[in-house]
Amino acid sequence: MAGHSKWANTRHRKAAQDAKRGKIFTKIIRELVTAAKLGGGDPDANPRLRAAIDKALSNNMTRDTLNRAIARGVGGDDDANMETIIYEGYGPGGTAIMIECLSDNRNRTVAEVRHAFSKCGGNLGTDGSVAYLFSKKGVISFEKGDEDTIMEAALEAGAEDVVTYDDGAIDVYTAWEEMGKVRDALEAAGLKADSAEVSMIPSTKADMDAETAPKLMRLIDMLEDCDDVQEVYHNGEISDEVAATL
């Protein structure tokens, strides 16, 4: 299946920004602790924990650090008293946006999220307002590789789809609970992915122009700056021409 590099570029940009802010490890550790507390410390029996471990390893977190986080969760660490909250809304240009948070204070979190929307010309919506536009999937990414080899191994392991982008990058899509199993099968076949994460994939896209694209990027930046925000998903699509002006 052919694709475009826009989505890969957006994801890589996001990862670079998180790393620059020094927040990504803090957010991953919080997810590891929470996942272990809610579902136990065995990743084979806890898909959420397995997904968090895959994300930690993709971001070069050491095994020692992630194991300590899991132990904190299993041990009932006070810091694990977090709840997952999903907010939905509309951004510039009618972009559908989903925000995944981990918080111990709903009032604080919703105030920060609402502030970001109000500053950037968006609107915080009600539950279900945009969720129907997204599907939860596992995404295993290769910056480069042989499409036929990866596709054959991935589909044999139970992947749902394989997308090749214009820049040579390849994404393998799976049911989110099966991502760890598929990644293990790919590695057993000698195919080591550059990253693996659970994501919300939009079914439709909203084209961003030179006016709306900067506003959308500002909104995403503000949301990602919130300590309680774990992930921001959107269906905005920015062309290479517009991206070059940002």
Swiss-Prot record:
Location in or out of the cell: Cytoplasm
Superkingdom per UniProt: Bacteria
UniProt keyword terms in alphabetical order: Cytoplasm, DNA-binding, Transcription, Transcription regulation
Region annotated Disordered, chain positions: 1-20
InterPro entries: Integrase-like_N, TACO1_YebC-like_2nd/3rd_dom, TACO1_YebC_N, Transcrip_reg_TACO1-like, Transcrip_reg_TACO1-like_dom3, YebC-like
Stretches of the chain forming a coiled coil according to its record: none
Entry's Gene Ontology BP terms: regulation of DNA-templated transcription
Keyword DNA-binding: yes
Bilayer-spanning residue ranges: none
Any one GO cellular component localisation term in the record: cytosol
Molecular function as annotated in GO: DNA binding
Protein family (similarity comment): Belongs to the TACO1 family.
HAMAP family in UniProt: Transcrip_reg_TACO1
Name the record gives this protein: Probable transcriptional regulatory protein YebC
